[in-house]
Amino acid sequence: MSEQQYTLPDLLQNWPWNRHLSPYYEEAKRESSAWVESFKPFDQDGQRAFDAYLLASLTYSHGSREFVRLGCDLMNFYFVYDEYTDVSDSAVADRLANIVIDAMRNPENSSQSGDHLLGKMTKHFWTRALAMAPAGSPCFEHFITTSETYLRAVTQEAEDRANKRVRKVDDYLRLRRDTCGARPTLALIEFGLNLPNEVVRHPSLVALTEAAVDLIILVNDMHSYVRELSCGHENHNLITAIMLEHRLNRQDAFHWLGSHCSRVVDQFLSDLDELPSWGEPTDSGVRDYINGLGQWVRGNDDWSTESKRYYGEDGETIRQERLVTTRSGESNYIKFGQVGVQDSVRIQPIEAN
């Protein structure tokens, strides 16, 4: 059995936001757990390993109890949706996207979602989300449009997976910015902040948001690589793209990732210093939004080692020592059956139109 060790770079060593766990973690976990289990999407071991509740409570950690609960539901939904599309071809993935989009745009009278569990989950989630801001708030349409882009991009990812396509770094990042779901995830931060459209769409704020999206991708692809390698899904990972395009070995690819991430962090902090003022109360909402971005980036990294999703019981050791071992021919740290991937997904058929 061949083994290889490599060192993980500390991607966020200069990130000014610190770990913060929501005080509503246990309460939101209890409520959201009961909610997602009521749909019975797959076995509970997969949900425990993913731990959507910890992810939401580390990333939306300064929000109200209702907001943290909403974040838990969103993370749970993404997990279920990703697991379904991971075992779907592009045609099925596209139909699943239609179900979800229709349920958000027409929660009271959705013709396409029917009784499919993804449609039901979307309606339940969106009904609660609509209560988080005044009717007609721009945040609702922003969330829907970014969600639609994400759902359509996942269909493209399914095609890449079927064709065993490996993209170059820039091309990969363009697609990954949509397939990772970070844009709608960060759009949720806007709920209740009453930020006008012209502020949210200002080039300075857009640049900060896009940098946060990239940092989420870089952190996620670093931590998920071992698991994806053992599962045969490493073609849709930035490390693979770096290795192939730049002809680097695995360790040097991680060094490249670390250097690239440092540049993104530096640019984020530089752009933050140049942010214009819109006057109060808008500036207060902008500060809350930016702190939400910063906490999401930090919390995503914290969750990656604190949950069992990527490293099983070894997360804390890996966080401290930064040393990871890959073993060819076997799952690393956790197996498919432990994380609810593929073999534990019971795909609900989609009714023909």
From Swiss-Prot:
Provide the residue positions that the database annotates as binding Mg(2+) 2.
D82
Task: Indicate the enzyme's highest-level EC class.
Answer: lyase
What does it catalyze?
(2E,6E)-farnesyl diphosphate = gamma-muurolene + diphosphate; (2E,6E)-farnesyl diphosphate = alpha-selinene + diphosphate; (2E,6E)-farnesyl diphosphate = delta-cadinene + diphosphate
The UniProt entry annotates the motif DDXXD motif at 82-86
Name the UniProt key words of this record, in alphabetical order: Lyase, Magnesium, Metal-binding
Positions bound to (2E,6E)-farnesyl diphosphate: R309, Y310
Cofactor(s) the record lists: Mg(2+)
Query: What's the EC number here?
Result: 4.2.3.-, 4.2.3.126, 4.2.3.198
Q: Which SUPFAM superfamilies match?
A: Terpenoid synthases
| Residues that bind Mg(2+) 3 | N220, S224, E228
| Site keyed Plays a critical role in the stabilization of intermediate cation: positions | F79
Q: What is known of its domains?
A: The DDXXD motif is important for the catalytic activity, presumably through binding to Mg(2+).
Q: In UniProt terms, what function does this protein have?
A: Terpene cyclase that catalyzes the cyclization of farnesyl diphosphate (FPP) to various sesquiterpenes, including beta-elemene, gamma-muurolene, alpha-selinene, beta-selinene, beta-cadinene, delta-cadinene and alpha-cadinol.
Q: Which family does it belong to?
A: Belongs to the terpene synthase family.
What's the protein here called?
Sesquiterpene synthase Agr8
Q: Which organism encodes this protein?
A: Cyclocybe aegerita
